[in-house]
């Protein structure tokens, strides 16, 4: 039996792969408790973090609708979380016996909406709402929410596409954006979708999507509408059906925006049922006011451009059996919405059972051959790794059949492909031109494996104005090849940064000379009316005339750049120039005062820099160093530069996360602050590679601009030196470009850290690899 000092454990009520949940008694005062134990002898750091995070978060809330946390105890080499022994069973167990009557459902639903509203008021996103995480007292009908191990206190998060088996939350209940397949960040409204799934199940006895296949379930959340509750429960009041389906909207903007607005609608349903015995129709959402500035993650004024992109995809999808390659060039200045436009077609592409992959050129990594190509195809590998073993083996066979004994030439550029193919024999060295021809031929063969008529491939390459020469040459040769592939190639670039003689223009001219005519989509600034629409969605409770005046001012100052508009609105809100009057239920501002304080006189970079300078000095320092790494960075690279632990760095970066200047790319970051240095030292750190990215290139650029030239050279040199020291020789080839780029960016200082002969040899190794790749 499990042994925990001062606790008598009566029974194990749940056994998971990593956690046991028990009922017991605290012996010091005979208080009944529920105990969550980390069962492994040496728990993983991420599991320790989750348990500590849950304890610290729940114990700080003190909410009646949340199962209380009493204490955290040491248990072997891990931890035990001591919880309130509330209720008798979970809603899952309760639902297994019967679907609750309508009145009982409303009582449960109102309590859950109220508790969720309180959680969101405390900036907590639960992220794993489901019947088994709701405990009910069957005598009183009271319900409480439990299990906050993956809950977040960030305004927004980014979840990249990952194996459905490894997603945060429970797959049957997670929102479309929580699957990581929507190219949008996640916020508190993910909980409304999960609540909608629960309500649907409580009313009908069925989940909206009951498939057991993980990939199919992700597809359902993204692309399929559930059967109407009216079909499953013929007598359900239409207004209650509408409430549930509003919660289940695919886009967060179309759901409820405030849990108390949801609660008000549910209370009106209960009142009618109590007083009249039935629920009649009424307008839902009348009290759905968040009081927060919430800029929608959707496109404005780009409807025709989206249609044009989809038309290109359909031409590729239904093209000639011999294959069809179509190029779309999306142009426009930074922040104008090029990436957002292209990402709009990701769901339709997924619905068509096709692959959407994306890579992004990095201004600081322009010398790395095939960098955006590698990034995009590594994301494809990650998608393939989510498939079943049998399907993955089929892909392996197809790829090897296409590449033959030369697969290693592709693995040199796309190392993650080895996760599917395994170790491959080396390929013979060839002169540079022949090596390049071999690679391009093999790459065309690889593309043909995935780019079939029944599942075309959409390849999106962003920021082509920074693309390396090898990638540009590959694109030119690919489009004029005889590859029998169905590919939609979308390239986005800042046309105002591409002057005559730029390599990208040379590539496009070469493609045109072959008789190839790309589709061109110019993304232009928003009109003043569209800016007004954006602001109306962000602040719906506003005086229309006053909002028009403010919209005109922001349109004039930002020249209709949507990212600039959003940054300006956020800054005005943070500076309390925009305030919500809860008494009157309306947004208020003083236009004259806004013009006086000077915020609207800043250009985009200056505005971002001013916001960066409001952060604590230590946070600013970390962002400056991170900017020298690139648009993405990780704590393990930063830590030795500043001589701090990753845990300390994560704590210092939290203000930047809370301001949405950087975003975490893997969920372990959400629980990092709960760890202790002892946890870090004692636990297995197998899953502690914590990665961030700057929200936008302009934020990265602003942070980089804060670094003085002399300091910049020093940081680059030290980064390169530390990367060299920390990389085993047998793995140095994998990161040789990153090492050399950093050292060369701080070459004067690098020469004081590394022997000149060593520095020359590293550059020679990088050049040799570049030749092999190119």
Region spans (language model):
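AlphaC helix of the eukaryotic protein kinase fold
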Residues: 42-60
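Conserved short submotifs of the Hanks-type protein kinase catalytic core
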Residues: 76-90
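Activation segment signature within eukaryotic-like protein kinase domains
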Residues: 108-109
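Protein kinase catalytic-loop region centered on the HRD/HxD motif
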Residues: 114-124
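C-terminal lobe helix-coil module of Hanks-type protein kinase domains
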Residues: 172-275, 559
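Short secondary-structure boundary elements
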Residues: 286-293, 329-336, 341-347, 375, ...
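Conserved Walker-type P-loop NTP-binding/catalytic site
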Residues: 371-458, 506-517, 529-536, 544, ...
